[in-house]
Amino acid sequence: MRIAVDAMGGDHAPKAVIDGVIKGIEAFDDLHITLVGDKTTIESHLTTTSDRITVLHADEVIEPTDEPVRAVRRKKNSSMVLMAQEVAENRADACISAGNTGALMTAGLFIVGRIKGIDRPALAPTLPTVSGDGFLLLDVGANVDAKPEHLVQYAIMGSVYSQQVRGVTSPRVGLLNVGTEDKKGNELTKQTFQILKETANINFIGNVEARDLLDDVADVVVTDGFTGNVTLKTLEGSALSIFKMMRDVMTSTLTSKLAAAVLKPKLKEMKMKMEYSNYGGASLFGLKAPVIKAHGSSDSNAVFHAIRQAREMVSQNVAALIQEEVKEEKTDE
């Protein structure tokens, strides 16, 4: 198995990316990695001579400020574009980048290619829950607008992923809404609710509210890309603010500092449960091969878990299973 990795994407590239790749090579004997980027820079950070790591030189880098479509079209020799081409031309089984999200989605769609039968791809991160199990949220921005049939496909893709990669036997699928009652929401959610209710191969549990997402209310939560992106950023921002407030309180007085010292192991345990990097990156579902968007601020641990995630998706043949499930759903219509 070979995974192509954009060595130049992310806030801490290339060092964090390369360190994460080395961890992946050490953890998985069946894994080969193609690091794509400036060869001289990459080799200066490589601390191993493993024959399972290959470097593919790229002259250009797609910057976070670049307009996605224009960058993919014009920067043909960028690390991200060459990475996607490795997958498209069957020299790699999956690819990972912590770079420009829009550019990666563009490269995934137009270079790797969309699965036949998938109307719209979906960007789907696994987010933490209080139990530590996490849940899959899709879409978080691949498509700002959506139709009911798109959300149904999201539910199918999310269910396949949760079964094959996360090991959930019968994933509970929830529809993000403003209330749990059947008739709640706008036309999109009302129509989607009815279709999901009648879809046989989905374990649909009904509407779910944003306030319950971290309480393990569902294994897969589907919504349009606009709502999903707002939800994702609200959860991220809230978590950061809560941890900041806790830190401020715990260091405000001598007594609180002593209490913090006693509670430190439990606080660390709680932080680990909420650590996004342990869940891998956001998968771009609906493409012919796994394309993983690692968080822009990914450290080596986050890159490693994105590699683990991509490896599992390839091993379990997730893309082919999604294609089969979507084909079956369309046949039943």
Swiss-Prot record:
The pathway entry for this protein reads as:
Lipid metabolism; phospholipid metabolism
Disulfide bond positions: none
Q: Listed GO molecular functions? A: phosphate:acyl-[acyl carrier protein] acyltransferase activity
Sorted alphabetically, the Gene Ontology cellular component annotations on this record are:
cytoplasm
Q: Does the keyword Lipid metabolism apply?
A: yes
The record's subcellular locations are: Cytoplasm
Catalytically driven reaction(s): a fatty acyl-[ACP] + phosphate = an acyl phosphate + holo-[ACP]
Q: Name one Pfam family in it.
A: FA_synthesis
Among its keywords, does the record have Cytoplasm?
A: yes
Q: What's the stated role of this polypeptide?
A: Catalyzes the reversible formation of acyl-phosphate (acyl-PO(4)) from acyl-[acyl-carrier-protein] (acyl-ACP). This enzyme utilizes acyl-ACP as fatty acyl donor, but not acyl-CoA.
Family according to the record: Belongs to the PlsX family.
Q: What is this protein called?
A: Phosphate acyltransferase
User: What is the protein's species of origin?
Assistant: Bacillus subtilis (strain 168)
